[in-house]
Amino acid sequence: MDNGKGVFSGEKMDEFRTYEDFLDSQIKPVDLFYLEDQELARQLVELGLKDSSLEREEFETRKAAAEASRLASGSQQKKLASTGKELKDNFLRALAEREEANRSGEMNSIIFIRDQNARGQEISAYIDYSHRLKSEDFEPYFSGKKRLLPKTSDLSFYNWRTQKSKHNNSSNYEVITENPSGLLFKCKNDRKILNVDPEKLPGDSSTRTPVQSDLYVHVVIYDHVIRKPTTRSCTPLSN
């Protein structure tokens, strides 16, 4: 039976699904011939590893670290939709600057767009950028093949010609319509309110950025940064 130390020098952790699989790899055919019991052979191998660097607990730790490294590597290899694109408009550059943060959950941006649809009707919407990134392919937008336009499924949609309006909650925001000064959006991640009234401050952890664009009549981006909760002990607030 081997002592198991060679697993770090040459063998890879992902070759073994469980610690028992690793123990089995240390058992030679001759061992099973004499012992005639695989479980006993495993116990003897495990006892022989007590003084080595690969006891069960260490194996599980290394296995978890290897899996975390694999997932992180896969995440890094996934390109952003804006990567490698020639961004000719301020609006596209602004979206590209915010893409990674909105994909990772560090930021939830709301995009206000006012423009015309294919019928020449003026339409506008408040768009949950993070939500759209997850549900749509943004490469055609960044490459200039398509324009990002308001949809009736966005947080808030309005057709100025027909006066048709629609409000929808998203995975990130709850729409609050019963407010005298206009629409409010409640972030589901931290429960903070984002105010899109241009005469008011946007709110805690939020900023308002008008964007001059040749592609649209009017564009404003509201960025809401998601603050991680502190580890400080405190009394929970009642709902």
Swiss-Prot record:
Keywords: Cytoplasm, Nucleus. GO terms for cellular component: cytoplasm; nucleus. The keyword Nucleus applies. It is found in: Cytoplasm; Nucleus. InterPro entries: DUF4464. This is Cilia- and flagella-associated protein 299. May be involved in spermatogenesis. It comes from the Eukaryota.
